[in-house]
Amino acid sequence: MAVTKLVLVRHGESQWNNENRFTGWYDVDLSEKGVGEAKAAGKLLKEEGYSFDFAYTSVLKRAIHTLWNVLDELDQAWLPVEKSWKLNERHYGALQGLNKAETAEKYGDEQVKQWRRGFAVTPPELTKDDERYPGHDPRYAQLTEKELPLTESLALTIDRVIPYWNETILPRMKSGERIIIAAHGNSLRALVKYLDNMSEEEILELNIPTGVPLVYEFDENFKPIKHYYLGNADEIAAKAAAVANQGKAK
């Protein structure tokens, strides 16, 4: 049976992951640790014999720079890359820039968990005169006002990620190209929910660690057979638990 592999990588730790802030579409860069995570992911993929024909990422530099570091370690810096806002992190609305633990102290752990992980729950909206509104950013100049989010739930994130997967990424895989996607916690959770047909309750508990390659294997009909992380299982579990704990009051 012919097996097709897809590699997903959540960006390495960002400066705002390190400061425990809601980031969303804010274009913060990788921390020093995050650069190291991205390089380590590339080294691991090289050791395991991976190489790629095409890459996808978002229009946010923490994902772009993660991909650059991964491809650099693979000696594939030349690889063609498509950047799309449809792979951006979920938009966190008026929470963007706020400290997660301080927000939990103010509103309670459960409310923040729902904002972070509730399937159809949207954080408080931005207003269009807010400097954080994406309509002020030239990289989104081609988007319609309807496409520009004031806030997003995971459900709304799925509404942009999955059509992009089906219409753009999957056809490349079906043509035989080996694909890597460097994206974000919630855009990847959106894709994982779809691929694994997870329930809303199951996706609530899923935490994707930063900078760890996640491999999906597909059968000849492009149905997922299995998935697994590359690397030390205990370290990966600890990183996933740390992601889950970010939204709790200290």
UniProtKB/Swiss-Prot annotation:
- Disulfide-bonded cysteine pairs: these are none
Which pathway does it serve?
A: Carbohydrate degradation; glycolysis; pyruvate from D-glyceraldehyde 3-phosphate: step 3/5
> What does UniProt list as catalytic?
H11 (tele-phosphohistidine intermediate), E89 (proton donor/acceptor)
Any one Pfam family match given in the protein's UniProt record, by short name: His_Phos_1
UniProt cross-references to PROSITE patterns, sorted A to Z: PG_MUTASE
Query: Which residues carry the site feature described as Transition state stabilizer?
Result: H184
Q: One MF term in GO for this entry?
A: phosphoglycerate mutase activity
Q: What is its EC number?
A: 5.4.2.11
Q: Tell whether Transit peptide is among the UniProt keywords.
A: no
Which keywords appear in this protein's UniProt record, sorted alphabetically? Answer: Gluconeogenesis, Glycolysis, Isomerase
Q: Does Membrane count among this protein's keywords?
A: no
Catalytic reaction annotation: (2R)-2-phosphoglycerate = (2R)-3-phosphoglycerate
* Biological process (GO), any one: gluconeogenesis
Positions contributing to substrate binding:
10-17, 23-24, 62, 89-92, 100, 116-117, 185-186
The record's SMART domains line, in alphabetical order, gives:
PGAM
Family annotation (PANTHER family): PHOSPHOGLYCERATE MUTASE
Q: What function does the entry list?
A: Catalyzes the interconversion of 2-phosphoglycerate and 3-phosphoglycerate.
Subunit structure, briefly? Homodimer.
Q: Which family does it belong to?
A: Belongs to the phosphoglycerate mutase family. BPG-dependent PGAM subfamily.
Give the protein's recorded name: 2,3-bisphosphoglycerate-dependent phosphoglycerate mutase
Q: Which organism is it from?
A: Citrobacter koseri (strain ATCC BAA-895 / CDC 4225-83 / SGSC4696)
